Amino acid sequence: MSEIPATDATAPAEKKDFIRQIVREDLASGKHTAIRTRFPPEPNGYLHIGHAKAICLDFGLAAEFGGLCNLRLDDTNPAKEDPEFVVAIQDDVRWLGFEWAQLRHASDYFEVYYLAAEKLIRDGHAFVCDLSAEQVRQYRGTLTEPGRNSPFRERSVDENLDLFRRMRAGEFPDGARTLRAKIDMASGNINLRDPALYRIKHVEHQNTGNAWPIYPMYDFAHSLGDAVEGITHSLCTLEFEDHRPLYDWCVDKVDLSGHPELLAPLLGKGYPKEAAKPRQIEFSRLNINYTVMSKRKLTALVEEQLVDGWDDPRMYTLQGLRRRGYTPAAMRLFVDRVGISKQNSVIDFSVLEGCLREDLDAAAARRMAVIDPLKLVLTNLPEGHTETLQFSNHPKDESFGTREVPFARELWIEREDFAEVPPKGWKRLVPGGEIRLRGAGIARVDEVIKDAAGEIVELRGWLDPESRPGMIGSNRKVKGTIHWVSAVHAVEAEIRLYDRLFSVEKPDDESEGKTYRDYLNPESKRSVRGYVEPSAAQAAPEQAFQFERTGYFVADRRDHSAATPAFNRSVTLRDTWAK
């Protein structure tokens, strides 16, 4: 992919968070003439809403300051990675409205990492250790007690080089040896207590096959990957703050910009020599109530079939949110509203829902749909009567145009819009009462038909002929207006009424001996058969509508077709969870 400036799908007002202030100062001082960022996900799962914040920051920052942003897939743990996730990650980034300057993989740099590791050995900064994982834990010490040096720490440079090369040759089994940095076992930062840089894993890699029986550890590969790509500002969440000294140690001790010979393997791949010293900057991660974002827990939800897959519209993966009907514009607006800071906080889920309502209120055409149908027969109209009415597609935006809506003697209305014994303040249909049928006229109910069990199955009534659209009587005041669809023309559809997956604000809270599984909301998905006007059934997959008086819905991207319409409720018209 050619190296073009990262582009944002919107042009937001200038933001003044602390990261942007750092970038402005770096550019103003001449420390950097241009900036480069990267988004470096591991392809071992689907991206979730927390990643949206990082994506918008990494790509948005580059776009805002005329820089570049790479997409780098951190594929250093092949046992857990899958090409399926690689495709999904790229799809998610593009869906959010961003394009990368270059698509890179950590595996592109495996030869560079290896040469860098040999340099550390030659410089006396790394050694091959034979301790087992359990022994390493015992030697590491605790937060209050210093660690102990490995008995293999003082091996000679020649012995370390020999052992490391034999590790690469595949001579030793998994876990037999590691390459460790030689830093300080007494450091107050446990990450600096001679951390592992390489481990032995005889696992086939999706890109390199069986060429490598050893793989770099995250901190080593991540820091050098940034340096290799000339990243100026390496942005990550606060849990990596304690890793920053190790990040800097790796960058400084390897010194790629001062040792261009280490970059020689890249020249054959056509990669430019652009090594630089990156700066790691941490920001608070995105925490939202009523959610879990642990990859382990999300995986369990899928594997235990508590949800219908990674793109279940109740999931907090970007694939799930997209299928639910969340839009890229709403996601970007949400990230802007949340902001960037170093203070951890929990964002109310209603903020996310509010951003979607705001976007769809402006962007979604209106349609009529009935999700719990009750038949209303207008007996003063002739048998078989039908006609075509003109409706505006959007009450606030004439550019959406108009559409034809069929009207007939027999209609479907919402069951909840009729009350035989109305509560106080009721403004909808009652026996003998009048209501305005949206865009069609004023109707009255004269007769209630029930089945043998006493259930209401049909209403019979009258349509005031003087109240039709354009007539003087259409201005006559009545208490309320309801929507409807023609029973003759309406298309039956599956209507999926989604809600929050968890019923409590903190599903991760296990203080009462419960787990997140115990807090699953039994009302998070309800599927009903309803009716939609014909133009709604003709929607393209992922087309969003406001179903009038009902909520915002999207044509399911997997299951919807004109013959078998399927709509997912994206969000209700109002916050039904407000306290």
Swiss-Prot record:
It is an enzyme of class 6 (ligase). A motif ('HIGH' region) lies at residues 41-51. GO terms for cellular component: cytosol. ATP binds at residues 42-44, 48-54, 237, 285-286, 293-295. InterPro entries: aa-tRNA-synth_I_CS, Gln/Glu-tRNA_Ligase, Gln_tRNA_ligase_bac, Glu/Gln-tRNA-synth, Glu/Gln-tRNA-synth_Ib_cat-dom, Glu/Gln-tRNA-synth_Ib_codon-bd, Glu_tRNA_lig_a-bdl, Rbsml_bL25/Gln-tRNA_synth_N. It catalyses: tRNA(Gln) + L-glutamine + ATP = L-glutaminyl-tRNA(Gln) + AMP + diphosphate. L-glutamine binds at D74, Y218. It comes from the Bacteria. It is found in: Cytoplasm. GO terms for biological process: glutaminyl-tRNA aminoacylation; glutamyl-tRNA aminoacylation. A motif ('KMSKS' region) lies at residues 292-296. The keyword Aminoacyl-tRNA synthetase applies. GO terms for molecular function: ATP binding; glutamine-tRNA ligase activity. Keywords: Aminoacyl-tRNA synthetase, ATP-binding, Cytoplasm, Ligase, Nucleotide-binding, Protein biosynthesis. Its EC number is 6.1.1.18. Monomer. Belongs to the class-I aminoacyl-tRNA synthetase family. This is Glutamine--tRNA ligase.
